[in-house]
């Protein structure tokens, strides 16, 4: 009987450890991603070395390799958090907006610029596809739906299919991206002599969608 009790206790302990291991792994994986999110917000993309992320997370410099096969995989997981944040902000402004498609798209574009200027490090990482594995870790699942929202709004504002809405949306996105970058670098405020980005936002929308009735 004592031997049987000992075996039972040992088996129970092993099962408990096995159950704890996936939870612990998930926790450490999440901690590495969170460390990267904090690091990119504070110091920018250039700070996201494996060693620095590990130091920020309080783990050994070799620990990230246990959870992310490559550096790009870890950067992609960090960028996914950025896309999720942008998606949440977008949903918040659109869900409570019953205005016209043009008004909704204006709110979407404004949210995009606000995100770019308030989170410059994360914003840069999200679109640095030379640093990311976009076909892994669900990155496309979080990034492409955002673009589709833009395409759908463009299609409602501009029913013409020549060029198709996806092309117009792509050109509009590229223009907004350029405005965000040049504004963040200080080039556009200097060139325009203004500290108000709103006129540039509206001019960008007018250029791709036609003038808005005012």
What do these predicted regions represent?
Residues 77, 91-122, 165, 169-172:
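Hydrophobic alpha-helical connector segments
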């Amino acid at each position: 009987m004592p031997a049987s009790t000992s075996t039972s206790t040992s088996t129970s302990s092993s099962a408990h450890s096995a159950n704890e291991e996936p939870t612990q792994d998930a926790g450490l994986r999440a901690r590495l991603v969170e460390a990267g999110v904090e690091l990119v917000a504070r110091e920018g993309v250039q700070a996201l070395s494996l060693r620095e992320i590990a130091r920020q997370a309080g783990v050994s410099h070799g620990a990230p390799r246990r959870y992310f096969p490559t550096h790009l995989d870890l950067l992609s997981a960090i960028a996914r958090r950025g896309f999720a944040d942008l998606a949440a902000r977008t949903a918040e402004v659109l869900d409570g907006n019953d205005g016209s498609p043009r008004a909704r798209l204006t709110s979407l574009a404004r949210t995009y610029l606000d995100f770019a200027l308030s989170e410059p490090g994360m914003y840069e990482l999200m679109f640095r596809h030379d640093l990311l594995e976009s076909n892994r870790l669900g990155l496309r699942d979080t990034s492409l739906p955002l673009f589709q929202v833009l395409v759908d709004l463009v299609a409602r504002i501009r029913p013409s299919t020549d060029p198709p809405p996806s092309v117009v949306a792509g050109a509009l996105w590229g223009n907004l991206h350029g405005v965000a970058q040049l504004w963040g670098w200080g080039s556009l405020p200097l060139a325009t002599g203004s500290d108000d980005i709103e006129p540039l936002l509206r001019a960008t929308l007018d250029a791709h969608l036609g003038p808005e009735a005012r």
